[in-house]
């Protein structure tokens, strides 16, 4: 009889702890990452010699099953259920020249996921796109094209102006800047944990629909915080576009402004900085990681900063 009673209590407790997608708690395995036990060194992954040889083979040669399985496992373990990013250690292939690195990236990208090609008024993304300072300089926080400038890129997620933002992206550091240019990251799970601690109502506000406007004729309405069909976090953030869309976001009031301000200030508290060495390849989960970049300088006597970028579905 007591066994039956305990079984009933267990069932009731299990039912009470179940949550719907709408009520999904912010607490996660990433709670207060990276300020507790996060080790940046754990994000680095060597490129096995067999995989490197496969990637450097002729472009018409099929990728081996070994390489495909290695890449799939890496994405599953590190990107979708791990820290939200990983770095292929460039010292594993430091002897490669730029053309060889482009070749490697073009061979590697389809192994990691489904690359996206996207051309719009805001940007051009090919299978592999060059990221260099093209002389663009911002005159307003509402007019930003981070990949074409040497100015600071504040925390954001990629492709927020699209109805369905990208799932991940790759950056291959061909040439570091003469000075500056470090990358910054914020884990969105940790960010939401912290905001919920301040006031649970903060999360309710971020779940409302906001307009993201590029000021170039591209505008989409979406919550900042949502979840996919599998319950995975989908965090969308580009402060400039949210500000551009403010006139169309009819629910914007003092409370919304307070939450936006709190989100910005909390991001600053949770940043980690990653300085990519020549050859390092970083792959980032765009739905759970915000990224940014410090301002940088090129120099006439130093090769200019140059990265390769790939987007993934």
Question: What annotation goes with each model-predicted range?
Answer:
Residues 81-128:
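Long, mid-chain structured domain cores
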């Amino acid at each position: 009889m007591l066994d039956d009673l305990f079984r009933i209590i267990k069932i009731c407790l299990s039912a009470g702890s179940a949550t719907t997608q709408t009520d999904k708690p912010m607490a996660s395995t990433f709670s207060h990452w990276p300020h507790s036990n996060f080790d940046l060194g754990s994000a680095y992954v060597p490129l096995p010699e067999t995989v490197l040889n496969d990637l450097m083979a002729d472009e018409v040669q099929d990728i081996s099953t070994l390489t495909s399985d290695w890449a799939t496992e890496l994405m599953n373990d590190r990107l979708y259920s791990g820290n939200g990013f990983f770095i292929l250690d460039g010292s594993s292939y430091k002897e490669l020249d730029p053309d060889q690195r482009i070749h490697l990236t073009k061979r590697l990208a389809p192994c990691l996921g489904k690359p996206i090609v996207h051309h719009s008024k805001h940007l051009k993304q090919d299978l592999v796109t060059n990221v260099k300072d093209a002389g663009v300089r911002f005159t307003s926080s509402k007019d930003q094209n981070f990949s074409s400038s040497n100015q600071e890129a504040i925390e954001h997620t990629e492709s927020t102006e699209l109805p369905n933002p990208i799932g991940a992206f790759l950056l291959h550091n061909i040439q570091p800047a003469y000075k500056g240019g470090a990358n910054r990251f914020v884990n969105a799970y940790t960010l939401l944990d912290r905001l919920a601690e301040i006031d649970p109502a903060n999360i309710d506000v971020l779940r409302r629909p906001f307009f993201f406007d590029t000021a170039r004729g591209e505008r989409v309405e979406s919550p900042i915080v949502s979840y996919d069909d599998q319950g995975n976090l989908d965090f969308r953030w580009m402060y400039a576009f949210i500000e551009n869309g403010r006139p169309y976001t009819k629910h914007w009031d003092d409370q919304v402004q307070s939450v936006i301000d709190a989100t910005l200030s909390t991001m600053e508290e949770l940043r980690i900085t990653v300085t990519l060495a020549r050859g390092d390849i970083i792959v980032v989960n765009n739905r759970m990681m915000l990224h940014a970049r410090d301002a940088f300088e090129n120099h006439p006597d130093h090769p200019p900063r140059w990265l390769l970028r790939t987007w993934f579905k």
